[in-house]
């Protein structure tokens, strides 16, 4: 398998190919891979014009990641938040543990983020917060500290389906796809992310939730201030 990369050329090609096929909100990662330097992780933030994303992820805390360590030092998080703001993008705040909510508060206090936020709970990483109903309910309760903010949940591996169902029931948004889970059912590889998205849409419909169009998704995710880069 190829090693993960954050080079602008690969992201530019992917964004153009996606744009030719469908209308979706484009979000790029600043997480990269374990051990990747911050400068490399921020590569996609250099894209401009029609090649630029609309959102970028912001990882706010260090966690154990299996047998590795996913390092997000305080000063690095501040730097990435500043670069996202300078690019005029909306951040998606990635939270892998309960204490990451407090780091998000610090970023708000320092003006590196502005309310309302869009928060993504990533649950089930071995070494971080477990994917359980109790944990998600606690996180959702803490969202009261971020007035007007939206949230979603990504369950890693076998946790993707139950977390998607729980998010729909609790009024949140759902993240699915091959980044977090490669199986459509036990032992059966998914033929791309599309089947996982289709399943998530059915979960929403079964819960009485409307699946957002691209236009509606932009209103939900992008109608918020961009933090001013100091």
PLM feature spans:
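Flexible glycine/acidic-rich beta-alpha junction loops that bind and position SAM and/or redox cofactors
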Residues: 33-39, 68, 123-129, 220-223
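Structured C-terminal cap/extension of enzyme domains
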Residues: 137, 141-144, 165-230
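Alpha-helix-loop-beta-strand connector modules within alpha/beta enzyme cores
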Residues: 2-30, 79-86, 139-146, 194-208
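Short, glycine/charge-rich beta-strand/loop segments that flank catalytic centers
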Residues: 28-38, 97-98
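Glycine/small-residue-rich loop that forms an oxyanion/phosphate-binding "nest" at active or ligand-binding sites
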Residues: 33-50, 54, 58, 62-67
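Glycine-rich, proline-tolerant flexible connector loops at the mouths of alpha/beta enzymes
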Residues: 1-12, 65, 122-127, 182-186
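Catalytic alpha/beta core domains of metabolic enzymes, predominantly
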Residues: 54-179, 189-192
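Short, electropositive alpha-helical surface patch
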Residues: 5-22, 42-55, 105-119, 174-175, ...
